[in-house]
Design a protein with these regions (language model features):
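Mature-chain termini and adjacent capping regions
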Residues: 1-181
């Protein structure tokens, strides 16, 4: 018994308990943070997307509340058969849970199952409309052609794209050419 008491007394000495001089602000307590996150997004029990990132930072007290996705983002979008129909990657994003919209930024790349590729520095996903939007320079690579523009509207699998202020080579099928006679 005396040995146990001495052991307990030694464990509670100067080396046993440490004091923290850190003061955590009230604002810091209102922010949730998670590392190495994978999120499955579903609707009516059907998986629609899988999102992976190194860091989530949630701020429910902001107006409007948001979730920052830092240090690289990768999303796979699925069709009803659970096949990947497109992927999205970027360095950062901000998710607004009130309307399920995303603001994706910095080195944004969207690739569909056909290999068509969209590159830009900023892209907005409007969940209600189920479309991507951008107002900054964009690059679209389809087959052997590259188109540039400032701004776009597109569906999530890039099967339909409207490029604003378009420039570059636009492929046209021979039967779509006007008669020159």
């Amino acid at each position: 018994m005396a040995f146990s008491f001495l052991f307990l007394l030694a464990a509670c000495g100067q080396g046993g308990v440490s004091k923290s001089n850190k003061v955590v602000s009230e604002e810091a307590l209102k922010i949730d943070r998670a590392d190495s996150v994978t999120v499955i997004i579903s609707k009516d029990g059907q998986t629609k997307a899988r999102l992976k990132t190194k860091e989530f930072v949630q701020n429910d007290n902001a107006k409007p509340p948001y979730l920052d996705i830092n240090h690289n983002l990768f999303v796979e979008f699925y069709n009803d058969s659970m096949a990947v129909e497109s992927t999205l990657s970027a360095k950062t994003a901000r998710f607004y849970p009130a309307n399920n919209n995303f603001l994706v930024q910095d080195s944004v790349v969207v690739i569909n199952k056909s290999g068509d590729t969209l590159k830009t520095q900023q892209l907005v996903w409007n969940n209600k409309l189920q479309k991507f939007f951008s107002e900054v320079p964009v690059q679209i690579i389809r087959g052997g052609s590259v188109s540039y523009g400032t701004g776009l509207e597109a569906n999530k699998d890039l099967s339909w794209i409207r490029i604003f202020q378009q420039r570059g080579t636009v492929p046209v099928e021979k039967d779509q050419m006007p008669d020159t006679e």
